[in-house]
Amino acid sequence: MALSSPVSPSLAKTNPASSTLDEGQRGSYWITTFGCQMNKADSERMAGILETMGYQEANAELDADLVLYNTCTIRDNAEQKVYSYLGRQAIRKRTNPNLTLVVAGCVAQQEGESLLRRVPELDLVMGPQHANRLETLLTQVQAGQQVVATEDHHILEDLTTARRDSSTCAWVNVIYGCNERCTYCVVPSVRGKEQSRLPESILLEMEGLAARGFKEITLLGQNIDAYGRDLPGITAEGRRQHTLTDLLHQVHDVEGIERLRFATSHPRYFTERLIDACADLPKVCEHFHIPFQSGDNELLKAMARGYTVERYRRIIDRIRKRMPDAAISADVIVAFPGETDAQYRRTLALIEEIGFDQVNTAAYSPRPNTPAADWNNQLSEEVKVARLQEINALVESTAKERNARYAGRIEQVLAEGMNPKDPSQLMGRTRTNRLTFFSAESPQGITHRAGDLVDVRIDQVRSFSLTGTPVIN
C-alpha cells in the first residue's frame, strides 16, 4: 500500500465524515491517550494541529465531532481496551455519520488496514510516525476516503505547536523509534527505527517553551540515551559528535527553564560521562528512570537486553556516588517465558538491594511479531497473577521506606496545578520526582500558583506521595 493511501477498492466507501471538515466548520475534537509518555507527547502535538485547523476541544467525548484514540500495544490489555472504546464509537457513528473517527499510535501501526475490516466505521488509521501529518491525512479523509498511513516515514521535525496539557512542564521529543530487539517488545516494529532530531531544532523548541512560561522540560525518547547514533559526525577524541550528554550541555542554559529531566534510559547506553554531566549540570534533576526488567542474567540474555545485573548495579552505584540523594525508578517484567522461581526471587532481591523509589511492574504479555510470543515455555496466568501481586507489595513497601527519609525535610517543589481533590492545595514534584501536595497559601500569607518553585517542609509521607507546608527560607 502506498504511503497514506486510500484503502483498497474492496474497503473503500464514500465518507460522510468529510462534511465536518469544511473550512470554518471544523467543530470539536476529543483525544483519548493510552500508554507511555511518548504517546502523551504525540497527543499534545495532534491536539495542537487540530486547534490550528479550527477545531475546539469538546467538553465530553460523546459531544465531539472528531474522536481520536492514540493507542498502545505494549500489552494485550491496553490493546483490548482500545477495541472496547472503538465499539462504542462505532455504534454512535451509525446514527451520526458525520462523526470523524481516528485511530492513531501503536495499535494503528500494528493492525493497519485490518483495523478497517474489524471496525469499518473508521475514517483514518495512522501510525505514530505520522502524528505530525494529521492535517494532511484529514484532508484526504475530506476527499471522501478511508485512509491508512502506516508506511515507514521520515518523521518531520517537531515544528507543530502542541496543545500542552500543563502550563508548567512540557515534553520535548528528541529521538523517535528504537533499534533494540528485545524479544518481548513490539515497540521497534510499531515505532520504527531511531530518528534523532537535530540539536538546533530541539533548542529552538525549548526556547519557545521558555518564552511561553514553561519551567520544566522532559526530553523524551523510547531509548533516549541512544540519542544521536543516527546523526553524522565524529569528534577529535573519536566519539560520536551527538550524544545525550552533549545535548544536555547544549540545552542546559535556556533562559527561563529551571529543570531538565529525560526518559526513558537503556542500561546498555547509560555511560559514566552521562552520569557525570547530570551531576555537574544544576538544572538536571536527580531522578533517573532506568528499566532493569529482570534480576537474573539468564533471563536478561533471553530478553536480549544486552547488559548484566552487574552492569546495572555499577550504573546505580555510580549515580549514587555522584548524587547520593538521587531517585531511581525502573520497569520490571515478571513471569517471562521460562522464568523459574529462583530467577523470580533474584528479581525480588535486586529490588530490595537497590532500594528503588518506584518500579513499574508488569506480568509478561505475549505480543505479535515478537520472538518470545512463540516460545513453548509460557507461564500460567495463575503464576503471573501471584508473582505480580507479590512484587507489587514489595515495590510499595520499598517506596514507602524510601519516602520516609523525606519526613521533616525541606524540599523544592515546582507547583504544577491545583490538587483536584482539595482546591486549597497545590500539587507538584520535587527534583527527585516525588508527587507533593501543599497549601496554596503559606503561613506567612504568600499565595503560590502553578509555575512557582516553592520550598515545602514535608509533614507526611505515603508510599507514592508527600504532603507538606510552604516555608520561607
UniProtKB/Swiss-Prot annotation:
Keyword set, alphabetical order: 4Fe-4S, Cytoplasm, Iron, Iron-sulfur, Metal-binding, S-adenosyl-L-methionine, Transferase, tRNA processing
Domain called MTTase N-terminal: residue spans? 27-143
Question: Which SMART domains does the entry mention?
Answer: Elp3
Q: Output one GO MF annotation.
A: methylthiotransferase activity
Entry's cofactor comment: Binds 2 [4Fe-4S] clusters. One cluster is coordinated with 3 cysteines and an exchangeable S-adenosyl-L-methionine.
The positions annotated for binding [4Fe-4S] cluster 2 are C178, C182, C185
Q: Give the UniProt record's GO annotations in the biological process aspect.
A: tRNA methylthiolation
Q: Does the keyword S-adenosyl-L-methionine apply?
A: yes
Q: What protein name applies here?
A: tRNA-2-methylthio-N(6)-dimethylallyladenosine synthase
